[in-house]
Amino acid sequence: REQACDAAAEMESNRLLQEMNRVRTQRQKRMLTETDTLTETANLLVDTYQESPDTYEAEAPKAVKESLGEQAEQAYQVMLVNCNSYTDAIAQYNEERKDVTVNFLTTQDYTQVGISSIYDPVGKQFSFIVLLLP
């Protein structure tokens, strides 16, 4: 009976894993457009880089932390360089250029994801800051 329970639990966890991968793959195939909200954009970015090897935990940027208080525990920052506009940033993301750098955390321990975006016209950098709110 115990073995049967273990087998059932393993089947269920495999099914969940397959479902997660299916959803992730579906999202990755979708191109971003200008009509996408920042939330959709950030979710797509997070999903796409979820398996990225060059990831590490990042503190929420100071300005963001101050505006949100202690809620914002951590953040991923997605930075797109050489952008003249949000449209450029989207085009660059869709082309998957090498100058897209992503620092991310897994969102599974968080109930909410807040989004902030910063465009620096001088440095022509566009940052998406994805806040993880516990």
Regions found by a protein language model. Give the residues of each.
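A well-ordered secondary-structure block
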Residues: 62-134
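Short, well-ordered surface patches within globular domains
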Residues: 2-68, 111
